[in-house]
Amino acid sequence: MFENLQKAILIRRYKRFLADIELHNGNVLTIYCPNTGAMTGCAEPGDQVWYSTSNNLKRKYKYTWELTFTKGGHWICVNTARANQLVKEALHNSEIEALSGYSQIKAEVKYGTENSRIDFLLSNENKADCYVEVKSCTLLEQPLAEGKGFFPDTVTTRGQKHLRELIEMKQQGHRSVLLFAVLHSGIKSVQAAGHLDVKYAQLFEQAKKAGVEVYCYYPELTLPCLEE
C-alpha cells in the first residue's frame, strides 16, 4: 500500500484538497490532498510528505499526498481512504482479535434509518451480525509525549449520525463496533474530542452506555519501499 512513494517538503495545504510541495530539485508541485479534516499537526510547512502517482489520465492531479513525517519524528497517514483498506486487510487476516471468527466480511452495506452505509458488516452462523464503523484518528494533542489522540478533529455531523446508527443496531440485537484506525505513530490512546465537537462526545458516551463496543487498531506505518 505504501510502496513506491516519493518524498518532498510541504509548502502549504490550501482549499482543503490541495497542497504545494517542493521536490528535491527545487521544483514546486501541486498535489491532491485526500483529507477533508482540519489535519491539525499533520500539515505543518517544512514537514516531509510522501506522495503516490496515479496513471489515471482523467485525474486533474496526478499525485496524491499519502504520508507525513513530522519534525517530531512521527509518521502520519493523511489519506483517510487508507483507514478502511488497512482495516479490511486486518479483518481478512484475523489481526483484530475482537473482530475475528466471522466467515463473511462485507463492505459498504446500507443500513439504519438515516440512509447510511456501514464500513464493514461481519456475519457468521450462530453469531449476531457485527456492524463495524471505522474512523481514522490522526489528532495528537499537547503534550505530545502523552500520546493522547482525539476524534474528531473538527465538528462532524456525519460522525454523529454514524453513532446514532450504531446505537440503533445495538438496540435491535446486533453487535455494534466503533473502530478507531490510529494513523499517527505517536498516538497511544483515543478519546472523543469534546472540546471540538460537544455533540459527538455526548453521543459517544451514549453509545458506550448502550453497549456499542469501542476499539483502537494500530496499523503498522512502516514503509517497505520508498523512492526519493
From Swiss-Prot:
Coiled-coil intervals: none
GO molecular function: DNA binding
InterPro entries registered for this protein in UniProt: SfsA (IPR005224), SfsA_C (IPR040452), SfsA_N (IPR041465)
CDD domains: SfsA-like_bacterial (cd22359)
Entry similarity comment: Belongs to the SfsA family.
HAMAP family to which the protein is assigned, alphabetical: SfsA (MF_00095)
Protein name per the record: Sugar fermentation stimulation protein homolog
Gene: sfsA
